[in-house]
Design a protein with these regions (language model features):
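Long recognition/docking surfaces used for binding and targeting
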Residues: 1-8
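Short alpha-helix boundary/capping motifs
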Residues: 2, 18, 22, 62, ...
């Protein structure tokens, strides 16, 4: 039976993708002005990020999960809607001086060419006005950013968490990054190592943004190391906004140089297994959400075929190797 978007998002949330830990929420708050009159969170969940602001601050939010939106409505001085923030502008003719967000990473969205509802397609088109292209349909990361910038006032500040892949992936996302860097949108990008979500620890990026600026340089931050990078260098790197491309490169190089090759190989294998486990969990949720996708068993059978192929080659007498041969 087809499951709802609510059930799908709950599955992802159970992976630790949506609840922002208090320490990280306060780190995000530190990038915003000290005195805030109002704040908007376009993917507010149960209102965790909105709760870090005082009762005197007007709070606005949208959340696709009705039950979570109901929890957020208990926040003093708040106006919360339940719905899809990328499909409907719930605060029409309003822009905000302060926006804070931790949108879900890497989820699909219905961009204008795929949105059957004319009004929803109109809003999705508006948030990408003047952009060179839309965010890809299978990944809404930059659609959330476009929405945030669309709702940000001319002198406002926004801070948002983002998965690292969005900083370097190519094609449409690279074109969007080029456009936004050219507008001077990003003032600061920080790598948050091992961000502690509910039941997982992942690296994320924290983006501090403005509507636009003549200053196209970006401050890249990794822990205590930071460096301001000019537009020309970012352009030379194909508008790759990965923090480690610009700061801490020598430290990273030394780290790998001194690492025991056997330990390195074991670490890589563990990372592959961890990533595969998370990918399968997400793929299963996608299959439950959209019955048009091929069954998860087909994917698992394909993985098993790859494993069997390598097991067979290793057991062949002609392919017996020593440990040294593998490393």
């Amino acid at each position: 039976m087809r499951k709802s978007a609510k059930a799908f998002r709950k599955t992802l949330r159970d992976q630790g993708a949506f609840y922002t830990p208090d320490a990280l929420a306060m780190k995000m708050r530190a990038q915003l002005p000290e005195h805030v009159a109002e704040v908007y969170d376009p993917t507010c969940g149960d209102g965790g990020l909105l709760r870090i602001f005082g009762d005197d601050v007007r709070k606005y939010g949208v959340e696709i999960d009705g039950a979570e939106a109901e929890k957020a409505r208990s926040i003093p001085n708040s106006t919360i809607f339940s719905g899809d923030t990328l499909a409907t502008d719930y605060f029409q003719n309003m822009q905000f001086d302060t926006i804070i967000a931790n949108p879900p990473f890497g989820i699909p969205w219905a961009h204008p060419t795929q949105q059957p509802d004319e009004n929803k397609a109109k809003h999705a088109s508006e948030i990408f006005d003047n952009y060179p292209t839309y965010a890809p349909a299978n990944c809404a990361d930059w659609a959330f950013i476009a929405h945030i910038l669309h709702k940000l006032s001319d002198n406002g500040t926004a801070v948002c968490l983002m998965g690292l892949g969005a900083l370097y992936r190519g094609r449409a996302e690279a074109k969007i990054r080029e456009y936004l860097v050219g507008r001077g949108v990003f003032s600061r990008i920080e790598l948050i190592r091992d961000a502690q979500f509910e039941d997982t620890s992942i690296h994320v990026a924290m983006l501090t943004m403005r509507k636009s600026s003549q200053d196209k340089s970006i401050l890249f931050v990794d822990g205590e190391v930071e460096r301001r990078v000019e537009y020309s260098e970012i352009k030379e790197n194909g508008f790759d906004l990965s923090v480690n491309r610009y700061v801490n490169a020598e430290k990273q190089e030394d780290k790998w140089k001194d690492l025991d090759p056997y330990a390195h190989e074991e670490m890589i294998r563990a990372m592959v297994c961890e990533h595969l486990d998370k990918s399968i969990t997400t793929s299963k949720a996608m299959c439950e959400f959209d019955p048009l996708l091929n069954p998860i068993d087909d994917f698992l059978d394909s993985l098993q075929a790859v494993i069997n192929k390598h097991r067979a080659s290793e057991s062949s007498p002609d392919n017996q190797t020593t440990t040294e041969d593998c490393l």
